[in-house]
Amino acid sequence: MLRREFLAVVTAAPAAAQTGPFRKLQEVPAAAPLRPDQDRGPLAGRRWRLRWMFDEEKRAASIADFCCPAPGLAVAALQIEGDFRSQPAVVVTRDGGESWRQVELRDNPVSLYALNGAHLWLIGSKSLWYSAENGLEWTKRNLPKSGRKRPVYRVFFLDENRGWAFGAGKVFHQTRDGGATWSPVPESAEIRLTDENTAWTSMAFLDGKRGLITGFSSPQRDEMRLPGWMAPEQALRRRLVPATTVVGETHDGGASWKFSLTSAFGRVVRVRASGHTGLAISRYGENFEFPGEVYALDFRTGGSRPVFRRRDLRVDDAALLEGGAAVLAAIQPSGRLFDSPVPGRLRVFYSTDLNEWAEMKVDYRAEGSAAFLSAPAPGELWAATDSACVLRLV
């Protein structure tokens, strides 16, 4: 695949949603997803059953991130609040959700990355942590020295040694020793963007050589410093302004990177890739007609197309399955604002061809403000919400 096609796949996705004069957009697909009772597909009759939930009277918990490193193994990083203290922890199951073990942490969790059950990393607010014991024991490693104003939000590893750390700021970092030491990716420092306005959001590799990283750069306006739920009328009136979408790509396993910039009204917040295909999840502002949308990516041709866009749903995560199928986890808010602190309803959809979608039955107790998906093995699917709910497809 030519470099210009590789980069065009992702940079075209958010830009295609709304460029130039505003135009009336339609929901995608035009027909509503099939109801669970209408579905006749391969997952018909299966449902998302609650496997773990934090349920205490005097304490509350929120999940920062969730992953499934191996079949039957699920790990949720959470923050427990109550009794005048805050306790970071992970909860782990190694038997498919039949039993769970809680392990206290020494750092507030930000995100997780799992290479497999033997190699698991946790980004904390202060340090990087590593587990070779399914998340049951953690040893301290180092985060890049990027300063408090440029925190690291995520890591990605190709193997137990080679990885990258990224987050706020245009410079991201690389490691060759599993996170013991880090060095800046030199090409990222040369990107012609304002450092304090830039952030990296997602990284994916198609194989051991070809990979991409996505981010954006957008000036922070004064009226955007308050969350929408604190000034809902103002949030709905905000004028949508374009940001700069930035995509980096490598064809040599991260030894070198090249970058492309484009103006877009959306931000790519997550990319999932498998073989020659991928899904990109874009996010828009509160005053936009749609909270976001999902694009299908074809890395062989450089093509992309919208496959899921609904007015009342914000897709947070996606999982690519065998045979070209996909699952989406979305939040339906309780009001008009998607950043409301009031938890919304978890809704899950799947498609075998990315054209027709069917909704799946989800336990009514599953709600939150953010959703996570993980598919550790064929036929095994997990979901979670930040309101401390973990579910498995049964």
Q: What kind of feature is each model-predicted range?
A:
Residues 5-21:
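N-terminal export signals
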Residues 20-394:
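Residue-level hotspots at or immediately adjacent to binding/recognition sites across diverse folds
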